[in-house]
C-alpha cells in the first residue's frame, strides 16, 4: 500500500475510501506484536488520520536517514515509491556512493538531480506532505502541518544512530547535539576527501583511524568526537573482516563487473564471492563469530 494509494482515493473525492483504507492500514500494519494498538484503528476519523500520518512520517524519516548513512541512492522517489510501512522498496536504477557526493543521481532521466543522494530527505518529506494532502477534507490543515514538524529531527536522529552503528561505536552518555555533529563532521570530511564512502566507515570502525590517510586537518573535528566513543562490542575488531584492507562495497561499476561474466559465459562465481563477502561483513557488524 503506497502513498499513491491514498492519492488515488483523494483524486476521486472518496473520503469514505480514505477512511476505510486508513483503518485497514492501522489494523494490519500498525498494531504491535503484543496486540496493543500503535495506531487505534477504531478511533474517530480525524484522530485516526492524525496518528497514522505521524506514524507513517516517522517510519519514512527513519528509512531516509538510514539511506543517507548507507550512502544509498534510491533513484526514483515519487509517491508510489513510498509505502505506508516506511520500508525501503520499489528500487529503480539504484546506486551506492563511490565517494561522498550529494549530487549523485541514479536514474539516467534525472537530468535536474531531483532524486539526487543529497535531496532524498526533502524528497521523503515531499512525499509525506502529499499524504497529508489526502486528509485535508477530514482533518484541519493546521493539525496536519503540526504532525510533520518533527520529520527532519526524526530523520537526523536516525542518521546519527546509523552512522554510529556503521562505525561500531557508542557513547557513555546521551547527547543529541554531539551525535548530530558526529554525522555532520563525517559527511563534511568525506566530501573533501578522496576516500571511498564505504572505505571511510571501514577505516574508522571502532572510532579510530585504522589505516593511513586520516591525518589531514579536515578529519580532526570528527576524530575528536570519536575519541570519546567506545566499541559496542570490545572484540569486534578481531573479526577477520577487519583484517581486509579494502572495504566491501557495491558501486555501479562493481555491479556491472559482476554481471559481465554472467552475460558472457553464465559465470556466477564472482557474484557468489561478492555475496559471501557481504555476508561476512554483516556477520562482523552483527558481532557473529566466523
Q: Where do the protein language model's features map onto the residues?
A:
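ATP-dependent phospho-/nucleotidyl transfer catalytic cores
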Residues: 1-74, 85-173
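Catalytic-loop Lys-Pro-X-Asn motif of eukaryotic-like protein kinases
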Residues: 79-80, 84
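Regulatory N- and C-terminal appendages and interdomain linkers associated
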Residues: 111-290
Amino acid at each position: 500500500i503506497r502513498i499513491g494509494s491514498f492519492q488515488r482515493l483523494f483524486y476521486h473525492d472518496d473520503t469514505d475510501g480514505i477512511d476505510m483504507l486508513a483503518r485497514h492500514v492501522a489494523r494490519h500494519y500498525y498494531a504491535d506484536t503484543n496486540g496493543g494498538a500503535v495506531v487505534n484503528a477504531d478511533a474517530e476519523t480525524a484522530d485516526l488520520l492524525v496518528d497514522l500520518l505521524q506514524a507513517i512520517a516517522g517510519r519514512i524519516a527513519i528509512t531516509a536517514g538510514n539511506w543517507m548513512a548507507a550512502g544509498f541512492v534510491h533513484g526514483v522517489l515519487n509517491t508510489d515509491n513510498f509505502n505506508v510501512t516506511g520500508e525501503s522498496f520499489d528500487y529503480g536504477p539504484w546506486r551506492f556512493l563511490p565517494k561522498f557526493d550529494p549530487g549523485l543521481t541514479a536514474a539516467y532521466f534525472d537530468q535536474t538531480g531531483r532524486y539526487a543522494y543529497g535531496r532524498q530527505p526533502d524528497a521523503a518529506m515531499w512525499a509525506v506532505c502529499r499524504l497529508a494532502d489526502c486528509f485535508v477534507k477530514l482533518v484541519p490543515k493546521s493539525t496536519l502541518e503540526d504532525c510533520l514538524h518533527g520529520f527532519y529531527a526524526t530523520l537526523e536522529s536516525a542518521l546519527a544512530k546509523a552512522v554510529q552503528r556503521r562505525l561500531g561505536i557508542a557513547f557513555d552518555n546521551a547527547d543529541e547535539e554531539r551525535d548530530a555533529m558526529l554525522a555532520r563532521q563525517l559527511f563534511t570530511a568525506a566530501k573533501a576527501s578522496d576516500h571511498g564512502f564505504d572505505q571511510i566507515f571501514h577505516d574508522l570502525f571502532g572510532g579510530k583511524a585504522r589505516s593511513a590517510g586520516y591525518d589531514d586537518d579536515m578529519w580532526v573535528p570528527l576524530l575528536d568526537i570519536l575519541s570519546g566513543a567506545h566499541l559496542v562490542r570490545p572484540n569486534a575488531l578481531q573479526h577477520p573482516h577487519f583484517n581486509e584492507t579494502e572495504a566491501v562495497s557495491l558501486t555501479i561499476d562493481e555491479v556491472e563487473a559482476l554481471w559481465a561474466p554472467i552475460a558472457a559465459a553464465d559465470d556466477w562465481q564472482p557474484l557468489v564471492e561478492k555475496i559471501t563477502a557481504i555476508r561476512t561483513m554483516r556477520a562482523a557488524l552483527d558481532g557473529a563469530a566466523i
